[in-house]
Amino acid sequence: MVLRDKMILLDENTKAIVQGITGRQGSFHTKKMLECGTKIVGGVTPGKGGQNVHGVPVFDTVKEAVKETDANASVIFVPAPFAKDAVFEAIDAGIELIVVITEHIPVHDTMEFVNYAEDVGVKIIGPNTPGIASPKVGKLGIIPMEVLKEGSVGMVSRSGTLTYEIAHQIKKAGFGVSTCVGIGGDPIVGLRYKEVLDLFEKDDETEAIVMIGEIGGGAEEEAAKFIEKMKKPVIGYIAGQSAPEGKRMGHAGAIVEKGKGTAESKMKALEEAGAYVAKNISDIPKLLAGILGK
């Protein structure tokens, strides 16, 4: 078997810092990331420089952390009111990939840092995301590695817990995951479905893709236009098939307005684009078996 040295987003060359490492969530998830082999080379909390968290050195600024560790990625566990500044600081320090776990970030703040990142060519995952995970390399974020097994299925989702459930079903059926990407449940996010699908399309380790969508917005319809041009098989599943109009379901992005963003319209768009559409979660492993011939 060829050793994989380059996967999508997260690979053997990823060296990450954790912004907000001394907080409860930051500290807890730093330990989890280290346990699965992720290279966490530093942490940042202003005023806490010089400390250690699980053996990881803490710095006062991202600039200082990057200078000392050559970090190229950051995971952000900073509270919502300070998240925008944390992202800007990471971008200005030369970080190339930023995973924003924080939820409840004001939409205008997100728009500002997403636009800034796009202007300078920095990849942002999130906000309000479980992050990314590659069983062979580790994870940036909070995805529980227990649900993942190494394999050739790429996963991309707007939901967190639903991703874990589907990953677990895929594992139980004997299949594994190349990379799992949570794009985030907010109305505005950094990398969208189509960008992640494009990365999977070019990834040698990925043979098939499972895309988990949900009601609200037009992200899945936008993805469907890209799926039309893809060579690799895509299985689509849309959560919220019984959701009433006008009611927000879980995520800020999950709301059906005036007949737009319904599960029905999304499933139709995916089907017309040539994707395999799973009506239930239990259909996903069956469809994978048909596609991958196992």
From Swiss-Prot:
PROSITE patterns membership: SUCCINYL_COA_LIG_1, SUCCINYL_COA_LIG_2
Superkingdom to which the source organism belongs: Archaea
Biochemical pathway: Carbohydrate metabolism; tricarboxylic acid cycle; succinate from succinyl-CoA (ligase route): step 1/1
Keyword field: Ligase, Nucleotide-binding, Tricarboxylic acid cycle
Enzyme Commission number: 6.2.1.5
Active site: H251 (tele-phosphohistidine intermediate)
UniProt-annotated binding residues for substrate: Y164
Gene Ontology annotations of biological process type: tricarboxylic acid cycle
Catalyzed reaction equations: succinate + ATP + CoA = succinyl-CoA + ADP + phosphate; GTP + succinate + CoA = succinyl-CoA + GDP + phosphate
GO molecular function, one term: succinate-CoA ligase (ADP-forming) activity
GO cellular component term of the entry, any: succinate-CoA ligase complex (ADP-forming)
Binding site for CoA: T22, G23, R24, Q25, K48, I101, T102, E103
Subunit structure: Heterotetramer of two alpha and two beta subunits.
Role of this protein: Succinyl-CoA synthetase functions in the citric acid cycle (TCA), coupling the hydrolysis of succinyl-CoA to the synthesis of either ATP or GTP and thus represents the only step of substrate-level phosphorylation in the TCA. The alpha subunit of the enzyme binds the substrates coenzyme A and phosphate, while succinate binding and nucleotide specificity is provided by the beta subunit.
Stored NCBIfam families: PRK05678.1, sucCoAalpha
HAMAP family recorded: Succ_CoA_alpha
PANTHER family found in the cross-reference section: SUCCINATE--COA LIGASE [ADP_GDP-FORMING] SUBUNIT ALPHA, MITOCHONDRIAL (PTHR11117:SF2), SUCCINYL-COA LIGASE SUBUNIT ALPHA (PTHR11117)
Family of the protein in this entry: Belongs to the succinate/malate CoA ligase alpha subunit family.
Protein name, entry field: Succinate--CoA ligase [ADP-forming] subunit alpha
High-level lineage: Archaea, Methanobacteriati, Methanobacteriota, Methanomada group, Methanococci
